[in-house]
């Protein structure tokens, strides 16, 4: 569901740093760690386990890298490119989160941690994969199929009224003390993360202005 490619310029990160960055890029906890408004909330553990099982990260070190119209050498500042492939319908909603977490993880490995925020030495591309182009378990898996895979661990809770569907992404969310929720006009909405909540509220506000 999320395939990540990390391209590293010569001398940018040593082998230990590459392994550390790859592990962090492929960790569900890191993906949500940027959102202070989530109140420490993490994706429901059983859904998170399913989500994590779909992560794959590959690291490349190209022998030739040109940036700013010149060939980079080991003496140049580190350059990194991250390509994150996600289901097409999720690309818009996930882009800001993905760009933030990938940049943060790489910046923490640089001697100058402010560099990626001052110069375009780290670029992140979020690429939406067309529906039907993701294959898992020997068959095409569309966005709705992935939503149901993430929701499957909480079907019993939903039947018992202890889980609600996130109105933005459609994933079942168990109602826990730390669940991100919003009460609007007496109706309770639950969200898998703070990002879904914020986007939902923004869409409601926009609809209200219309």
Predicted regions and their residues:
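N-terminal, Lys/Arg- and Ser/Thr-rich interaction peptides
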Residues: 1-16
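Long, charged N-terminal interaction/targeting segments
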Residues: 10, 17-157
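Short, flexible, mixed-charge glycine/proline-rich loop motifs
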Residues: 152-163, 183-184
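Short cysteine-rich clusters marking metal-coordination/redox-active sites
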Residues: 166-170
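Zinc-coordinating Cys/His ligand positions in small cysteine/histidine-rich zinc-finger domains
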Residues: 174, 190-193
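Short Cys/His-rich "knuckle" micro-motifs
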Residues: 176-179, 203-204
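Short linker/helix segments within small regulatory modules
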Residues: 179-188
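Short metal-binding segments enriched for Cys and/or His
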Residues: 193-210
């Amino acid at each position: 569901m999320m395939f990540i490619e990390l391209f590293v310029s010569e001398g940018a990160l040593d082998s230990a740093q590459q392994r550390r960055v790859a592990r962090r890029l492929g960790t569900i906890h890191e993906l949500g760690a940027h959102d202070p408004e989530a109140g420490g909330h993490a994706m429901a553990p059983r859904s998170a386990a399913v989500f994590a099982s779909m992560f794959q990260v590959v690291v490349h070190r190209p022998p030739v890298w040109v940036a700013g119209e010149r060939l980079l050498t080991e003496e140049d500042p580190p350059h990194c490119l991250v390509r994150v492939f996600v289901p097409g319908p999720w690309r818009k909603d996930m882009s800001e989160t993905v760009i933030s977490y990938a940049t943060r993880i790489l910046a923490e490995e640089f001697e100058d941690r402010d560099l990626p925020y001052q110069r375009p030495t780290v670029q992140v591309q979020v690429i939406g994969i067309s529906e039907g182009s993701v294959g898992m378990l020997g068959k095409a898996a569309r966005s709705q199929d992935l939503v149901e895979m993430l929701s499957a661990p909480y079907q019993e809770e939903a039947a018992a009224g202890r889980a609600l569907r996130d109105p933005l992404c459609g994933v079942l969310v168990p109602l826990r003390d730390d669940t991100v929720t919003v009460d609007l006009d007496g109706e309770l909405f639950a969200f898998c993360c703070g990002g879904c909540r914020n986007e939902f509220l923004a869409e409601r506000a926009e609809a209200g202005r219309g």
